Swiss-Prot record:
Underlying gene: rnhB
Name of the protein described by the UniProt record: Ribonuclease HII
Catalysed transformations (reactions): Endonucleolytic cleavage to 5'-phosphomonoester
Organism: Thiobacillus denitrificans (strain ATCC 25259 / T1)
Record keyword Hydrolase present: yes
Family as reported in the entry's similarity comment: Belongs to the RNase HII family.
HAMAP family the UniProt entry points to: RNase_HII_B
Gene Ontology biological-process entries: DNA replication, removal of RNA primer; mismatch repair
Domain of life: Bacteria
Cofactor(s) required for function per UniProt: Mn(2+); Mg(2+)
NCBIfam families cross-referenced by the UniProt entry: PRK00015.1-3 (NF000595), PRK00015.1-4 (NF000596)
UniProt-annotated binding residues for a divalent metal cation: D20, E21, D112
Length: 204
């Protein structure tokens, strides 16, 4: 089934860079973006939207992408930048950093979603691109695996919040931990559940 899905993904023009992000929705941690230029001479089987892959498959494919891609780069925007800029602009900043950090300059940049950052590269937005375009799928896999590893690191530093289980998303367990322990330095103060909690605690 994976092989059939891979064949259906659009390869795109030569010199195409695919871009995707991970971590727009969570209450904690950075937003991570990845940019990938695939090598048509070294195809990678099994590429698809990272959310539709098992963790083991994501890790295996991430290793293949790093080994076989013409170029790739992963970048992030910090929690402080998210709170200062808002999550949309911070995501665009992370994407800009990822493309700018690649060792090869792309001819075209295709971005997952409905908008592109303001930059000089020729680009287009592709809605659900991580399930349509191979390079965007590869970028989604790198962004997801890198961010998950970052959140596991935060779990070691702040085990009370369970970051390794929910990766910062607003699960019932995470919200309960926030209520019991307050916010840590890696929580996004601009996000409503965190902000409301801080507002409530400041009243007492």
């Amino acid at each position: 089934m994976t092989g059939r899905r891979t064949v259906s993904l659009h390869v795109g023009p030569v010199g195409l860079c695919g871009v995707d992000e991970a971590g727009r929705g969570p209450l904690a941690g950075p937003v991570v973006a990845a940019a990938v230029m695939l090598d048509p001479k070294r195809p990678i089987k099994g590429l698809r939207d990272s959310k539709k892959l098992t963790p083991a498959a994501r890790e295996r494919l991430a290793d293949e992408i790093r080994a076989r891609a013409l170029a790739w780069c992963v970048a992030e925007a910090s929690v402080a930048e998210i709170d200062r800029l808002n999550i949309l602009h911070a995501t665009m900043l992370a994407m800009q950093r990822a493309v700018a950090g690649m060792s090869h300059a792309p001819d075209d940049v295709w971005v997952d979603g409905d908008r592109c950052p303001e930059w000089t590269w020729r680009s287009q937005a592709v809605v659900q691109g991580d399930d349509k375009v191979a390079a965007i799928a590869a970028a989604s896999i790198l962004a997801k695996t890198v961010r998950d590893e970052l959140m596991r690191g935060l779990h070691e530093a702040y085990p009370l919040y369970g970051f390794a289980q929910h990766m910062g998303y607003a699960t019932a367990a995470h919200l309960a931990a926030l209520k019991a322990n307050g916010a840590c330095p890696h929580h996004r103060r601009s996000f409503a559940p965190v902000r409301l909690l801080l507002d409530q605690t400041s009243l007492f």
